[in-house]
Amino acid sequence: MPLLDSFTVDHTRMQAPAVRIAKTMKTPKGDVITVFDLRFCVPNKEILSERGIHTLEHLYAGFMRDHLNGDSVEIIDISPMGCRTGFYMSLIGTPAEADVAQAWLASMNDVLKVAEQAQIPELNEYQCGTFDMHSLDQAQSIARSIIAAGITVNKNDELKLSDEILNGL
């Protein structure tokens, strides 16, 4: 099985909250797709609560589009990581990490403005596969912790696992 890009970086050295360009690629038509690692938690030290990450999934995807989409950027998808330490965001374009961090902070402030659970988008059995597994309180607690900590940048060249380590795993 091929080694995926996300497993070639040293998770023991990742900082969080942090933005990382996980991958860039070009489509056959020449559009650039950028995949961002939006790391909310330090891997193997912290984890996002199940209800909190699910509620953030519903809120964060829309708020990030509000703050980042424009003439040169269009978000394709924002999805939670299986390890529950953050989200992957795929988009058309090449926004700077600082712009992504600004949009992320603005989105966290938007999460804090949601007044009640009923305002969570797509919170019903028709549009959500586990519509009763949500917590606005937990999502807002996560947002507050991101705002308080601030967002940094993880660089691939600083996190790259050596061939020696990869071959020994």
UniProtKB/Swiss-Prot annotation:
> Keyword set for this entry?
Autoinducer synthesis, Iron, Lyase, Metal-binding, Quorum sensing
A GO BP annotation: quorum sensing
Q: Which family does it belong to?
A: Belongs to the LuxS family.
Biological role: Involved in the synthesis of autoinducer 2 (AI-2) which is secreted by bacteria and is used to communicate both the cell density and the metabolic potential of the environment. The regulation of gene expression in response to changes in cell density is called quorum sensing. Catalyzes the transformation of S-ribosylhomocysteine (RHC) to homocysteine (HC) and 4,5-dihydroxy-2,3-pentadione (DPD).
Report if keyword Metal-binding is assigned.
Answer: yes
Q: Which cofactor does this sequence's record say it needs?
A: Fe cation
Record-linked InterPro entries: LuxS_sf, Metalloenz_LuxS/M16, S-ribosylhomocysteinase
Q: What intrachain disulfides are recorded?
A: none
What are the EC numbers?
4.4.1.21
For the keyword Acetylation, the answer is no
What protein does this entry describe? S-ribosylhomocysteine lyase
- Originating gene: luxS
Taxonomically, the superkingdom here is Bacteria
Q: How is the cofactor bound?
A: Binds 1 Fe cation per subunit.
**Gene Ontology MF term list:** iron ion binding; S-ribosylhomocysteine lyase activity
Q: How is the subunit organization of this protein annotated in UniProt? A: Homodimer.
Known catalytic reactions? S-(5-deoxy-D-ribos-5-yl)-L-homocysteine = (S)-4,5-dihydroxypentane-2,3-dione + L-homocysteine
